[in-house]
Design a protein with these regions (language model features):
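Beta-rich, blade/repeat-based domains predominating
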Residues: 2-15, 31, 50-66, 99-130, ...
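Secretory-pathway ectodomains
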Residues: 58, 66-73, 77-80, 131
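Mature catalytic domains of secreted/periplasmic carbohydrate-active enzymes
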Residues: 28-29, 60-61, 79-81, 86
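A short loop-to-beta-strand structural motif that recurs across blades of beta-propeller domains
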Residues: 30-34, 75-78, 140-144, 192-194
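Conserved beta-strand positions in repeat-built beta-propeller and related beta-rich domains
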Residues: 20-27, 68-73, 115, 133-136, ...
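Short loop/turn segments that connect beta-strands within beta-propeller blades
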Residues: 36-41, 81-85, 146-150, 197-201
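Beta-propeller domains
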Residues: 8, 15, 19-47
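Beta-propeller fold detector
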Residues: 44-47, 87-104, 152-157, 203
Length: 203
């Protein structure tokens, strides 16, 4: 039995299976990723380790296999197989904005401690094989990782001027025809969309 609460991310794999990332604040850990077939029938669930912090999720093919990339606003990002086996898991990046970041620990479900500066909300895949992570509930930066999940840059930060962000949530690489390719960021608290180059320059 899964108690359904806040749904924050939905992704679809090549077979049409739908992966829903949700967050519950129950005292007992529950699976945070629930998988359905294309008709809405339950297939499986997993991810008790994401209990209380489940947020963005997306699917990408690496080589001949698809993987899930997951954001947990308890302070880390992860890559897993489609059945939930963790490939890697990373906490706050070791760059200037996060030098004082501490490992995130949920002492009371639903309540966040002070000093936890990395609280990622969503992910987008870059054309070079890397990816971006939006630190929506943390320090409001967009962090760029290469294809090996190594941090190679960051931009944004808290503010309401051009290129600054407050609670960046949805992000995606927009390469539709007739448009300049750009990373689009849903700058939630500023109630706007912002556009950036792949290198992080504000457009």
């Amino acid at each position: 039995h899964i108690r359904w609460q806040d749904t924050h991310g939905v992704a679809v794999d090549a077979e049409g299976l739908v992966y829903v990332k949700h967050r519950t604040m129950t005292s007992q850990p529950q699976d945070a990723v629930v998988v359905f077939d294309r008709k809405g029938k339950f297939v499986r669930s997993f991810g008790k380790e994401f209990h209380g912090g489940g947020h963005g999720v997306d699917v990408r093919r690496d080589g001949n296999q698809e993987f899930l990339y997951l954001c947990d606003n308890k302070g880390y990002i992860a890559k897993s197989t489609l059945k939930g086996e963790i490939v890697w898991k990373q906490a706050a990046p070791k760059i200037a904005p996060y030098q004082k970041a501490k490992p995130f620990e949920v002492k009371t479900p639903g309540k966040y401690g002070k000093g936890h500066l990395f609280s990622p909300t969503n992910i987008a895949f870059a054309p070079d094989g890397g990816f971006w992570v939006g630190d929506g509930y943390g320090s409001h930066y967009i962090i760029k990782y290469d294809k090996n999940a190594k941090v190679v840059g960051h931009f944004g930060g808290a503010g309401d001027g051009p290129g600054k962000l407050r609670t960046p949530h949805g992000l995606w690489w927009d390469d539709r025809k007739g448009r300049q390719p750009a990373l689009v960021v849903a700058d939630r608290a500023n109630a706007r969309l912002q556009y950036f180059t792949a290198e992080g320059k504000h457009l």
